[in-house]
């Protein structure tokens, strides 16, 4: 029998339909590319590219796009045993516009409801979730039932499992206001608080950390996340780089990489997969954060998200090149 997986992620999956032309608004785009999408799915792909055994817990529609998701996961080396079909809803599709360096509007088609929000608690393989070395969940998974209860059930099962063999339980704060009733952060905060009580790592940008904590300054955000129960808080500050703070007060600040941005949408997911890779390797915060930051920078310089995830040698090469500058 195979041992525990390195990483199980839970949450969104879909198909990204991205323009193959940059600087062109959607009404004028003539050519598009089709890519596997969904943040936790991309995180699993990113970690698989780095040599980790990964799987995703999610749902697709029973349609050709759902078939594509299964096919793409297998091609990326991600275990799809917990990716099942839902008859009632179509596989989500996401369009974007690409205006480098920092304007990438997203258009989500997840109505009447996304299949990944109808994961039920009784469907979960709780022994596998508990045994996984890293478990990754997202804020979007908390936005609606039954996904909300399923996500919190998975977190509670890991916490009750005594953490034997576990490396980390990661909460990607992942704030998408369009998925929440009224887009109100106050409505999300109690559920974020419940998830943080079981997580050991929290990661998000300053705005997402603000939703979780009510704070707006990066250091205050990190301190509030630690007070909420996590052992490591990672705050992504955009052009100001990344701040990582541990429960013992150890603080690491990493500057951003100087890259020519093509599409910034996949950078955070590459960061997440690389973060999991470093956690699994037992790296100290500075090495962990530098590696994850470099992985995100590489993907920001590429068009796709899942297909753009870097291999370890590419990340190492970027870090080595910058070390000699």
Over which residues does each language-model region extend?
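Hydrophobic faces of well-ordered beta-strands that scaffold small-molecule active sites
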Residues: 169-171, 202
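Conserved phosphate/ATP/ADP-binding segment of small-molecule kinases
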Residues: 163-164, 177-251
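Conserved N-terminal subdomain of the carbohydrate kinase-like
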Residues: 53-139, 164-166, 317-325
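Glycine-rich phosphate/adenosyl-contacting loop at the front of the ribokinase-like
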Residues: 1-79, 119-120, 260-262, 325
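Flexible, glycine/proline-enriched loop segments at strand-loop-helix junctions
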Residues: 109-110, 134-146, 176-182
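Active-site beta-loop-alpha junctions enriched in small/polar residues
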Residues: 111, 140, 174-178, 207, ...
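Active-site metal-binding loops of divalent metal-dependent hydrolases
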Residues: 13, 140, 173, 270
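Conserved phosphate-binding/catalytic region of the ribokinase-like
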Residues: 1-8, 156-157, 214-325
């Amino acid at each position: 029998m195979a041992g525990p997986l390195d990483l199980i992620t839970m949450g969104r999956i879909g198909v990204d339909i991205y323009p193959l032309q940059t600087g062109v608004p959607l009404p004028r785009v003539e050519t598009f590319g089709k890519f596997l999408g969904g943040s936790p799915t991309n995180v699993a792909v990113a970690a698989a590219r780095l040599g980790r055994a990964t799987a995703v817990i999610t749902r697709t529609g029973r349609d050709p796009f759902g078939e594509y998701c299964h096919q793409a996961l297998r091609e990326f080396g991600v275990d799809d045993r917990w990716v099942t079909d839902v008859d009632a809803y179509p596989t989500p599709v996401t369009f974007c516009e690409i205006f480098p360096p920092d304007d990438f509007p997203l258009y989500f088609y997840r109505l009447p409801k996304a299949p990944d929000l109808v994961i039920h608690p009784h469907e979960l393989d709780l022994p596998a979730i508990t045994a996984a070395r890293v478990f990754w969940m997202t804020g979007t998974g908390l936005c609606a039932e039954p996904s909300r209860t399923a996500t919190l059930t998975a977190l509670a099962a890991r916490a009750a499992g005594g953490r034997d063999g576990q490396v980390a339980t990661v909460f990607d704060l992942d704030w998408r206001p369009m998925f929440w009733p009224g887009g109100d952060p106050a409505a999300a905060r109690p559920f974020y608080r419940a998830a943080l009580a079981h997580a050991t790592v929290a990661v998000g940008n300053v705005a997402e950390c603000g939703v979780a904590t009510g704070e707006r300054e990066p250091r205050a955000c990190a301190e509030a996340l630690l007070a909420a129960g996590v052992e490591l808080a990672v705050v992504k500050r955009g052009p100001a780089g990344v701040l990582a703070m541990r429960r013992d007060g150890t603080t690491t600040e990493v500057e951003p990489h100087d890259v020519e941005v093509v599409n910034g949408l996949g950078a955070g997911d590459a960061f997440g997969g690389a973060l999991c890779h470093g956690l699994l390797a037992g790296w100290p915060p500075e090495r962990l954060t530098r590696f994850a930051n470099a992985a995100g920078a590489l993907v920001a310089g590429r068009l796709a998200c899942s297909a753009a995830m870097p291999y370890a040698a590419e990340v190492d090469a970027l870090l080595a090149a910058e070390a000699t500058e």
